[in-house]
Amino acid sequence: MKAIVIGAGIGGLSAAVALKQSGIDCDVYEAVKEIKPVGAAISVWPNGVKCMAHLGMGDIMETFGGPLRRMAYRDFRSGENMTQFSLAPLIERTGSRPCPVSRAELQREMLDYWGRDSVQFGKRVTRCEEDADGVTVWFTDGSSASGDLLIAADGSHSALRPWVLGFTPQRRYAGYVNWNGLVEIDEALAPGDQWTTFVGEGKRVSLMPVSAGRFYFFFDVPLPAGLAEDRDTLRADLSRYFAGWAPPVQKLIAALDPQTTNRIEIHDIEPFSRLVRGRVALLGDAGHSTTPDIGQGGCAAMEDAVVLGAVFRQTRDIAAALREYEAQRCDRVRDLVLKARKRCDITHGKDMQLTEAWYQELREETGERIINGMCDTILSGPLG
């Protein structure tokens, strides 16, 4: 049996590894000639870390995951802690530590694990067809590839999604812009083992440790889509949006490199009622494009891969296996997308009365409520 995997990002490579573990040959195709990850880093929470270990890639997480031991929210003006707490209870309850990791490092290490030479780059899909014998995809260079099944892990702009769904869904602007990048850890910004988030005015500034003595940082600002802002205006834009914010925020704006800082308008897509059509399955962002507000986008793709591998260990009936994959994943990924959307709206001031109430909750937070919510999300994954 042979699978075609479209996309060599986190989801596609996880899927290829999972299928190979289940005894299925995989050919992996990637649209671009060189993968340049969108975003500087990614939060891999314990459900994702467990998936990576299950797939044989646990060493990547252990080596490149940042030392995240505490969490704190700080007042945007004073910089004083609203709440601060240890993540030890979360680690104890979930059985794994969270691993914030540079996207470039994660992508590189996963490619090396799969085998960079085993990925065919520069292969952008135009269409696919299914018949009784299998699935065929065609690429923009005129070539084609055939297999017994097809995994569409081609991202939030998936070319194969409309074929599976029977319609072309519209991406939904979440209402905010995110700037993100990497800077050297500086205790004047935040403790080097802590996820620190400054909140106020429906905006936030966050710092999270990754490997090699660096912080992953991001700024969120509720804004209209399509503003004429770029790297040339970046520092001035952030200085304007965060005028009057605490000294560490000003220091971060001064320290960042505009040329390596990403500016992203955040979108999601309404959850789908299906992920499979015949021999073709959607996986990762192609199947559930979410905002990053609960840090579960990459983890969900890893979960997809683990379930995909498991269903093919149970049966070699492709249609039955993919129906079971869909049955196990649809409700889970819908829940994650909608949880992230709800969190997004509260964080970014869609209703400032609710956002102000959240700020007050943070001032009374011991950590227990937040950790309970995170554990509920994490432990609902396929590996518990």
Swiss-Prot record:
- What's the top EC group for this one? oxidoreductase
Q: Which gene encodes it?
A: hpxO
**Which family does the record claim for this protein?**
Belongs to the FAD-dependent urate hydroxylase family.
Query: Mind telling me what this protein is named?
Result: FAD-dependent urate hydroxylase
Keywords of the record: FAD, Flavoprotein, Monooxygenase, NAD, Oxidoreductase, Purine metabolism
Q: Which NCBIfam families match?
A: urate_HpxO (NF033623)
UniProt superkingdom: Bacteria
Please tell me where substrate binds in this chain. N178, R204, Y216, F217, F218
Extract the InterPro entries matched here: FAD-bd, FAD-dep_Monooxygenase_BioMet, FAD/NAD-bd_sf, HpxO
Which transformation does this protein catalyse, written as a reaction? urate + NADH + O2 + H(+) = 5-hydroxyisourate + NAD(+) + H2O
* Gene3D superfamilies cross-referenced by the UniProt entry: FAD/NAD(P)-binding domain
**Needed cofactors:** FAD
